[in-house]
A protein has these predicted regions:
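Short Asp/Glu-rich motifs
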Residues: 24-25, 63-64, 94-95, 125-126, ...
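Short histidine/acidic/glycine/proline-rich micro-motifs that form metal-
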Residues: 19-22, 26-28, 57-62, 88-92, ...
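N-terminal pre-domain/capping segments
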Residues: 1-82, 100, 107, 138, ...
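Acidic/histidine-rich catalytic cores of soluble enzymes
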Residues: 1, 101-196
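A conditional alpha-helix N-cap/helix-loop micro-motif detector
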Residues: 33, 64-65, 95, 122, ...
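Active-site groove signature of glycoside hydrolases
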Residues: 75-93, 109-119
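Active-site-adjacent beta->alpha loops and helix N-cap segments on the catalytic face
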Residues: 91-101
Length: 196
């Protein structure tokens, strides 16, 4: 992945080092594997490719956020500056408190915590994400916009343009076929409704 990022002309690479606990998921956990950690460190140096962020620090009631700490520590040692996360519950009081704990944990290692909204997740649109960032009131927490998901959430360019720059740290510039919003959301929700 690091080599491909370099060959494709990117300035940074992102690595998914926090497991999703999915069936058949490959193990890619440098925090638990000293050889893998050393190999990643060597590849970053060989290809002159800085590690920008790791993912995905999900906020869900069935996940223990303390499992993220070793991943944050390893990422910081590899030069990362950021963590990407998302929220998977509609319990606002709980997810706000828990997101604050994740942000504080990230800050221990000099990392910024970027929260992505998705129209079928717990934080579903730009305004909900901004509200969460405001409620947290921490200087290392930002809104993360994935342009594909933002479009599916009904976010417009004008809405983004009106949003103060302070909320944004980086974006995911993604594209793909865009079925009508309701069709897209209904299809995805049918697949993940038991997770929310």
């Amino acid at each position: 992945q690091i080599k491909i990022a370099k060959e494709a002309g990117y300035d940074f690479v992102s690595l998914r080092t926090i497991p999703m606990h999915l069936p058949g998921e490959p193990s890619f956990l440098p925090q638990d594997d000293p050889k893998l950690f050393a190999d990643i460190k060597a590849a970053l140096k060989e290809y002159d490719m800085p590690l920008m962020d790791i993912e995905l620090a999900r906020i869900r009631k069935d996940l223990d956020i303390n499992e993220y700490k070793p991943a944050f520590e390893a990422a910081a040692k590899l030069g990362a500056t950021d963590v990407l996360g998302s929220v998977w519950t509609r319990d606002r009081a709980w997810y706000t408190e828990t997101a604050g704990k994740v942000a504080d944990m990230a800050k221990e290692f000099g990392l910024k915590f970027n929260i992505e909204f998705l129209p079928w997740a717990g934080v579903r649109n730009l305004q909900e994400d901004i509200t969460l960032v405001d409620d947290l009131g921490r200087d290392n927490v930002f809104v993360m916009v994935d342009t594909l998901h933002a479009g599916r959430a009904g976010v417009t360019g004008a809405e983004l343009a009106r949003t103060p720059r302070k909320y944004f740290n980086f974006i995911h510039l993604c594209d793909g076929p865009a079925p009508e919003g309701a069709e897209c959301k209904d299809t995805v929700l049918d697949n993940i409704k038991d997770d929310l």
